[in-house]
């Protein structure tokens, strides 16, 4: 049995944020989605895909960045371009994924869980440059750490993860420069 179970994230998130933000982390059966409170549920829902731990981490990162008005909208008011993107659309997708994936990496490190950058384009007509994208995300991680600018909810979640998994404080040394495996 893995030491990282999605149920742990649900418990950590609920304990940390439900009372203050009326938001719950929910295991979904399909694609992830954020749903504000409505007639179906009196609380906001961060629905992650298929019980995947990494999906829960990633959806939490988007929630930690979204402002109060965005959190009142389905999917924070953003349009999502599905898998199968061309090079131009993929480039635009990666730009908006830098900060969320930097938080993913910080969350994973705080939980002692391996991080993998996601280009999320398995059915696209070209191969995204994962090393380049990981290096860009790495730069954002370094900026967050150097400038002590991790968004407040993200910092709170990091502290909760560190407490639950008994991991050390985050330092730049824990985030090595992504090497090119083909160089």
Regions inferred by a protein language model and the residue ranges of each:
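Post-HEXXH active-site segment of zinc metalloproteases
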Residues: 65-98, 117-127
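Pan-zinc metallopeptidase signature
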Residues: 119-183
């Amino acid at each position: 049995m893995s030491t990282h179970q999605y149920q742990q994230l649900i418990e950590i998130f609920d304990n940390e944020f439900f009372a203050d933000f009326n938001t719950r982390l929910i295991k979904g059966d399909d694609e992830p989605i954020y749903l504000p409170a409505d007639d179906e549920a009196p609380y906001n829902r961060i629905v992650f895909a298929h019980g995947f731990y990494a999906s829960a981490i990633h959806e939490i990162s988007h929630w930690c960045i979204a402002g109060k008005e965005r959190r009142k909208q389905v999917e924070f008011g953003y349009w999502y371009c599905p898998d199968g993107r061309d090079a131009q659309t993929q480039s635009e997708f990666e730009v908006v994924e830098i900060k969320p994936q930097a938080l993913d990496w910080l969350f994973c490190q705080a939980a002692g869980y391996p991080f993998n950058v996601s280009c999320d384009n398995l059915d696209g007509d070209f191969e995204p440059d994962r090393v380049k994208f990981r290096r860009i995300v790495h730069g954002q991680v370094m900026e967050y750490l150097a400038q002590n600018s991790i968004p407040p909810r993200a910092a709170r979640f990091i502290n909760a993860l560190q407490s639950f998994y008994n991991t050390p404080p985050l330092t730049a040394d824990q985030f090595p420069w992504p090497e090119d495996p083909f160089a």
